[in-house]
Structures are given as C-alpha cells and as structure tokens.
Amino acid sequence: MHELAYGITSNNAAFGAVHNGVKPAYMAGGSSGGTATAVAMNMASAGIGSDTGGSVRLPAALNGLVGFRPTTGRYPNSGMTMISNTRDTAGPITRTVAEAALLDEVLSGDNSSLAAIDLEGLRIGVPRAYFYETLDVNVASTVESVLKKLSAKGAILVEADLDDIGELNEKVGFPIVLYETSQLLPAYLAKYQPETSTEELVAQIASPDVKGIVADAMAGAIPEEVYRDARDVQRPLMQAVYADYFRDEGVEAIIFPTTALTARPRKDDMATVDFNGEQVPTFPSYIRNTDPGSNAGIPGISIPAGVSSEGLPIGVELDGPAGSDRRLLAIAAAIEKALTETD
C-alpha cells in the first residue's frame, strides 16, 4: 500500500511499488493498492482496505474490481491506525458486488438480504458539472456507454448537478485529514511506542511525498480554527447538499466515473502524470471524483465498467444517501448484471 495510506499510486519507497494486477507495468492505485492487486491476481478471493478519500474505490477501479466504501461509522475501526477519525473507514475490495455485500454483512452485522432491483423506472442522478469534467477520452466514452445501457434498461437518468460541490470539497477535505493526522499519530505513538517521538517517525518515512505531507501536518499546517470550521460548518453544509439532492431530484443514487483517467505507467517519480497531453498533479487528478462522497460520509461503490483501448480497467461509481448501504449494494448488483449481459 502507499506509505501511511497517504497517496494513490502505492509507490512505496520503503517496500517498493505495487504493480497493477491487470497491467503490471502500470500503477496499482492506492492507497490500498496491494489489496487490489492481490485480488486481481487471484492471490486472494477478496480483501479489506482503508478508505479516506478513495483508497478502496480507486485501486478497485484501476484493477477491474469492485470497491465499496460504506457510510462512515458503519464498520468498527478497531485494528486500524487512523489518519482521520472523521473520514476513515474500512472497505471491501472484491470481484463481484455479491462478494462485497457478503463482506459488508460480516463487517457491519447487517444481515438484511439485498432487494432485487428492477432498473425499469429507477431514478439515477447524473451530475455532469464537476464529476464529468475533463475526462480521459476512454473514460468518457466508456461511461457514456454505461449510461446508454442503463437508459435502454429503463433507468431514468436525471441530469442534475450538486451545488458548489467542488468548492465545499476543498474546504472540507485536507483541513480535516491533515489536522486529525497531527493529533492521531502522536496519540498512537504515545500508546503503542512511547520511546519513538513524532519527529523520529517523520524522519523514518521513506516516501518523499508522504514525508512532506506528514511533516507539514505535524508542523501545524492547519490551524485549529480552520479545522473546526471544516468539520463543524463546511462538512454539514456538504452533507446537506447531498441530502437535498437525493430528496429533491428523487434519485436513489448518483453515477459518475470513479476516476477521470486510467492507470498510468509506473515510474520512480509519480508526482505528475500525463492527462490529455498535459502533465498534471497525480493525487488531486485521481481523487477528484471519489473525495466528495468520502468527505460527506456517504456510501459509494465502484464497479467495473469496461476497459480502455490499451486494456486498462475503467470503473464507474455509485454514491447513495447516508445509511442506504444495503440498498446501494442492491442497485450496484443490478447495474453490474446489466453491464455484463451480452447484447
């Protein structure tokens, strides 16, 4: 995985880069890239990763798998070393939605059976602004094909946008995770390894990108008042935007590309990647679509949607209202079936 779960390539300077399970010369995604690759290469039937801003769904998408992030708080966090108690959750990475639903049942204790969903008349939101902007050409064509198939099955695609979602996401995401990391890592050391100081921990981080982020967090990059505004004001506003959207548009889920671009070739320095002919920052480019739902704490699931012209997996994500986990899994299962049916 990416060191300390702080990245999306799984290029780990301490243990080496994780290879993509479908195209080994390409990045696995992250931060739970090792889990995804193990499942993709049949080393495991399923796995459990951690998801702060996309770390389960993103590597699942890039490896042709299913990745499920539950409503925050649905699963116990015992055994996890948290970097954000507000945002972190465990999540299954599997080959099928049914397997993800089984692990959800085990992890949550919710053994309610999945409803049989008829796509005919099912209302699904399509938020074009933000989520569909600036896509890799293969991703764009694949997702449009998915929407066409769903429409042909009778699903009602509601073209409506989430108000100010990008702006709210910026105000919530990094302020919360960086501040909480600055509190949680020292507390972890004090409890489990009191002989190691925070400064010593930071000095031992092998990955330069992670060391820079964690060092900034520990140095107080996020003032407490900014954190409290993000957690207590901006995040509730963001949650209200989602709740209002689901209610006012009468949709049970929203659908969008899990990532705006496919996996890129592995290289030593992955601070930037090629995206539509330009070098762009890797981290924000990949988490753009997975991050908002994470910050709002709502459930999201990435399922395989197809492959690029190079054979690289492409995922499509479904997000649902807070607490609708089993319903969202049932909807995902119905869409998975529709996408795998031969014409």
Regions picked out by a protein language model, each given a short descriptive name:
Residues 1, 162, 305:
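Active-site loop/turn elements of alpha/beta-hydrolase fold enzymes
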Residues 1-90, 127-129, 256-278:
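Short glycine/serine-rich loop/turn segments
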Residues 13, 289-290:
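C-terminal core of ALDH-fold dehydrogenases
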Residues 18-32, 73-80, 182-196, 283-287, ...:
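Short, basic, helix/turn surface patches
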Residues 33, 95-98, 288:
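A generic structural signal for residues located within well-ordered alpha-helices
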Residues 41-47, 52-133, 140, 144-153, ...:
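Structural helix-boundary/capping segments
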Residues 106-287, 295, 337-343:
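Amidase signature
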